Amino acid sequence: MNTLYYSFMMSFLKENHPEILKSIDKIYEPDLSKISKVIDCYCKFAGIPIQQIVGEYINYSDIQHRYKAIAVVLRIFQPEKFTNLKTKVKSTIYKELGPCLKINNDILQKSIICACNQFDLYRDFKMEIKQIANYYLIDARFNKDY
């Protein structure tokens, strides 16, 4: 699904069927084995290769992509984390996300804190994360590749 088509579809839903978007916002994915697919979906949506956000040392300009990818994962697998920042991230998310991004738990924990803070502070960041999460959920629902 290309992003232009997706944006038209989202505009149509927002204008004509806002209740559908509200119900999508309440969906979360219980299968944590799909975390790598969410990361792949984020990279596809952002138009970047996954190697850009993987590894201990990445370019400073790519760090925002890592934070956004982590925020999308949290939005899909543990959305309550964004309503209460004191909620602990599920240990199974750490176990899946760390190897997927090829980073240790310390860097992952700091990245999660940064992603949550940006989600809390910046409206544009929050809107983009919700948009990408909705893109994944819709794409996963209609394309059984995910």
Where on the chain are the PLM-derived regions?
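Basic amphipathic recognition helices
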Residues: Q51-K95
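General nucleic-acid-binding
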Residues: M1-Q51
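Short acidic DE-rich linear segments
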Residues: T3, L137-Y146
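Short, basic interhelical loop/turn and adjoining N-cap
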Residues: I93-S111
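Residue-level detector of well-ordered alpha-helical segments, enriched
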Residues: K34, V38, R66-A69, I107
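Short Lys/Arg-enriched helix C-cap and helix-to-coil transition segments
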Residues: N117-R141
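Short, solvent-exposed secondary-structure capping/transition elements
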Residues: P79-T87, L108-Q109, Q118-F125
